[in-house]
């Protein structure tokens, strides 16, 4: 992956941080707005292999709406997160971003480990710190 592509992927992961935070606090309007920002960041990635891997995610990000119930948005975010986890595991994008999962809700996400050492589960408000760090990059 070129340095330019790496920078654009990191920009997308940074946009995902904002989306992760809005899911963690669950602010429906912020969830929709940050989903759009992540989609725009993905659109800015020019590496063909990476964009192919994230193409499905763009559609799922478009389906994340403030008017949806939380579970619908959680399902779409989980699908987006699975693609981002694949990117983080396949390419060297630095050590900040790692894959996390919660066995209770059976969902995964990418989290900035350097900013948040503790698990921040974006799916389960009743279990905000349930889950585990699955990778160490």
Regions found by a protein language model. Name each.
Residues 1-137:
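Intrinsically disordered, low-complexity terminal tails/loops enriched in metal-binding residues
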């Amino acid at each position: 992956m070129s340095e330019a592509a790496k920078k654009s992927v990191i920009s997308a992961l940074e946009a995902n941080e904002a989306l992760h935070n809005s899911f963690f606090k669950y602010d429906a309007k912020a969830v929709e707005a940050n989903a759009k920002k992540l989609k725009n960041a993905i659109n800015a990635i020019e590496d063909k292999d990476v964009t192919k891997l994230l193409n499905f995610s763009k559609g799922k990000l478009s389906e994340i709406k403030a008017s949806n119930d939380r579970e619908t948005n959680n399902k779409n975010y989980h699908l987006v997160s699975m693609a981002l986890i694949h990117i983080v595991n396949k390419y060297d994008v630095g050590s900040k971003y790692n894959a996390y999962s919660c066995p209770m809700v059976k969902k995964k996400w990418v989290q900035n480990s350097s900013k948040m050492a503790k698990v921040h589960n974006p799916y389960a408000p009743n279990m905000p710190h349930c889950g585990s760090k699955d990778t160490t990059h």
